Amino acid sequence: MDLYGRKDPSKSGNWFSTSRTALMDVFKSTSDSISDEVADLFAEHKKEYRRVRDEVNAKYQNLISELNNSVMDKTFQGSLADYKKQYNKLVSAMNDERDYMARNIMGGGIGNLEDIYDALSGGVFRDKGTVMYGHGSSYYRSQESRVHETIANYAALSITRPDLIELLKADKPDLVAELDATIVELLKKVGDG
């Protein structure tokens, strides 16, 4: 919605969120610190991610080993191309299942919250491994990119995980207040169009 809330949606730039001086000012003045409660959540999430990752990897490594063994003991029915196709299919399924499960750990949405904190840090948190999700410093060179990602993730969490919004609000009350105000204004603009 932020993209389409521009003054002229047919032209690039001048997104609704970054055209709001109040949001840009609050964003610039918001600390990139992480409260203990949020840091504990991220640590728990990382631990659970590793468990899920290891579980999914083990499941598919067993299937890949069975496939490889069938080639070695000559019980595999098919050509080398058939083997490669089945192998690639297993690897793809492993990656898809791991990604799906990782995004839904602990009710989902924690990656969105991590992305917000990564944006506040200018990508440093992802670069240093403080968070698992985000874009890193090369993406966040521009303040506008940070704001765009923050508003997108905030809007998603507002719908799917209001409990995580409350956690962010406890840590960054001024930012949350301005994000809420921005979304209200954007919804008014969309309603007028």
Locate predicted features:
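Active-site-flanking segments in enzyme catalytic domains
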Residues: M1-G193
